[in-house]
């Protein structure tokens, strides 16, 4: 509940900054927009489930609101998983050497993922204010590169737990949580790409 409240607050503040209108989005229209937009993602059901909780903060047909919200959620969940994995090393006193090294590497690459997603959230906000096509495309290229790299970081963490010799319980716990984050990040990247494509055609 605390994490969801944190995500809600960050999204509320971020979208308030981005909005040029103070009008409250219609819940039904926003829900329809979310469902339609999520069909372009690799995990549409997860996409809808993740974003629907914040439908009232996403303006109808506003692809930037949608992409921004998806990125913020991805960032919050990546942070949560990084904290979880770090705590796991402290709460579980005995690890095989292979497990310990895999967890250590995982914490490092997840930290990189968090940094890249945080950069992406800020850059996407700046891209929304771009008045020239070249400036917009440059900023969106940065966002796409960083989110893609964040997804690679998350996948790299999973690779460390792919060996059969890896302990079952630790492997299941970490894989379950990191797979979820990777899927959320994948969806966010798809929505970022969608925003970049739609917005770019509007420039002269």
From Swiss-Prot:
InterPro entries: Invertase/methylesterase_inhib (IPR035513), Pectinesterase_inhib_dom (IPR006501), PME_Inhibitor (IPR051955)
Disulfide bonds, paired cysteine numbers: 38-47, 106-157
Glycosylated residues (UniProt): 26
Subcellular location: Secreted, Extracellular space, Apoplast
Recorded GO MF terms: pectinesterase inhibitor activity
One Gene Ontology cellular component: apoplast
Keyword Glycoprotein in annotation: yes
SUPFAM superfamilies (UniProt xref): Plant invertase/pectin methylesterase inhibitor
Signal sequence, renumbered to the chain: 1-23
Main localization category: secreted
UniProt superkingdom: Eukaryota
Keyword annotations: Apoplast, Disulfide bond, Glycoprotein, Secreted, Signal
Summary of the tissues where the protein is detected: Highly expressed in roots and etiolated hypocotyls. Expressed in seedlings, leaves, stems, siliques, floral buds and mature seeds.
Subunit note: Binds reversibly to PME3 to inhibit its activity; the stability of the PME3-PMEI9 complex and the inhibition of the pectin methylesterase (PME) activity is pH-dependent, based on protonation status of amino-acids at the complex interface.
Function in brief: Pectin methylesterase (PME) inhibitor that probably targets root-expressed PME and PME3 in a moderate pH-dependent manner, mainly in slightly acidic conditions (pH 6.3 and 5.0) and to some extent at pH 7.5; this processus relies on changes in the protonation of amino acids involved in intermolecular and intramolecular interactions. Regulates de-methylesterification of pectins in roots and affects root growth.
Homology family: Belongs to the PMEI family.
NCBIfam families assigned to the protein according to its UniProt record, in alphabetical order: PME_inhib
Name of protein: Pectinesterase inhibitor 9
Organism (species): Arabidopsis thaliana
Gene designation: PMEI9
């Amino acid at each position: 509940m605390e994490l969801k409240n944190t995500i809600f607050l960050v999204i509320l503040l971020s979208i308030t900054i981005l909005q040029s209108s103070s009008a409250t989005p219609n819940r039904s229209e926003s829900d329809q927009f979310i469902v339609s937009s999520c069909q372009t993602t690799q995990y549409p059901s997860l996409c809808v489930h993740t974003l629907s909780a914040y439908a009232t903060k996403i303006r109808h047909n506003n692809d930037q609101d949608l992409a921004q919200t998806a990125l913020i959620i991805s960032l919050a969940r990546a942070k949560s998983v990084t904290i979880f994995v770090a705590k796991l090393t402290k709460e579980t006193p005995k690890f095989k050497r292979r497990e310990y090294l895999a967890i250590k590497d995982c914490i490092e690459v997840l930290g990189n993922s968090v940094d890249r997603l945080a950069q992406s959230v800020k850059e996407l906000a700046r891209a929304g204010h771009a008045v020239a096509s070249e400036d917009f495309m440059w900023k969106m290229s940065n966002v796409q590169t960083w989110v893609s790299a964040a997804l690679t970081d998350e996948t790299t963490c999973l690779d460390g737990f792919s060996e059969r010799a890896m302990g079952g319980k630790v492997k299941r716990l970490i894989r379950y949580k990191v797979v979820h984050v990777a899927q959320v990040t994948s969806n966010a990247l798809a929505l970022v790409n969608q925003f970049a494509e739609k917005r770019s055609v509007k420039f002269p």
